[in-house]
């Protein structure tokens, strides 16, 4: 299935293991997800050129609008033949890539996310979701980033901050688990909204009564190898808080500004 040009519609995978080719496509939605992947499906998204998917909304909304929703038990493989190919994904009340959150009460768990050989920009404009990962009280499966360039922009307000990659929260409770994140041979730029959250890992708030420690937390079993993580505070930040370089064994060297 190949999509190109501009359109206002969602792509819903009913079953099976399809390959979706995004060839210089611009797909927007006002509700639901630009691409919806069910449990049991392994869906491959082949990226060609410069592509944008998801919501154009910039305000809070009462229905989730996501870029790519992959249900628990499902797998999405986002790939291309090189990092000159770009996918830009936007979500509100939903991760740009991952889970979604409905009416402040209902969370949908996310499955596994594999990003390889591609450049991805992921944005969420609501702190109930990480840019890549979980939304609300939902969980997310394993996030693999391999031979890729990723920019992940978490959201927030003056009291709360979501990580670029990781978990989120709802109005009832803090999530006590984060996705397993495995990064190799990649360049990751992660933007937290303010200093309360992790860069990768947990959401946080001004009370400090959360699991966030302002760190790169890849979860139990996660790792970073042969990769560089650029850490920013503020969605418009142009200067890093720190740059952490990981060698082939996962040993970090941190350079702070």
What are these regions (language model features)?
Residues 1-257:
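A composition-driven surface/loop motif
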């Amino acid at each position: 299935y190949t999509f190109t040009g501009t359109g206002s519609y969602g792509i819903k995978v009913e079953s099976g293991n399809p390959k979706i080719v995004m060839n210089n496509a611009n797909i927007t939605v006002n509700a639901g997800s630009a691409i919806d992947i069910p449990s049991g499906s392994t869906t491959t998204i082949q990226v060609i050129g410069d592509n944008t998917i998801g919501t154009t909304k910039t305000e809070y909304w009462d229905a989730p609008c996501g870029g790519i929703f992959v249900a628990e038990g499902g797998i999405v493989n986002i790939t291309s033949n090189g990092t000159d190919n770009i996918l830009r994904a936007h979500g509100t009340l939903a991760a740009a890539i991952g889970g979604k959150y409905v009416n402040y009460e209902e969370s949908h768990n996310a499955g596994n996310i594999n990003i390889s050989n591609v450049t991805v920009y992921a944005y969420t404009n609501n702190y109930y979701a990480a840019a890549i990962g979980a939304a609300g009280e939902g969980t997310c499966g394993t996030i693999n980033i391999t031979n890729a360039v990723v920019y992940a922009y978490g959201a927030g307000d003056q009291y709360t901050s979501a990580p670029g990659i990781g978990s989120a929260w709802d109005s009832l409770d803090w999530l006590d688990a984060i996705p397993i994140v495995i990064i190799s041979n990649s360049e990751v730029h992660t933007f937290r909204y303010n200093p309360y959250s992790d860069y990768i890992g947990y959401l946080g708030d001004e009370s400090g009564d959360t699991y966030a420690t302002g760190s790169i937390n890849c979860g139990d079993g996660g790792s970073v190898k042969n990769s560089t993580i650029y850490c920013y505070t503020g969605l418009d930040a142009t200067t890093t808080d720190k740059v952490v370089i990981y060698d082939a064994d996962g040993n970090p060297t941190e350079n702070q500004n």
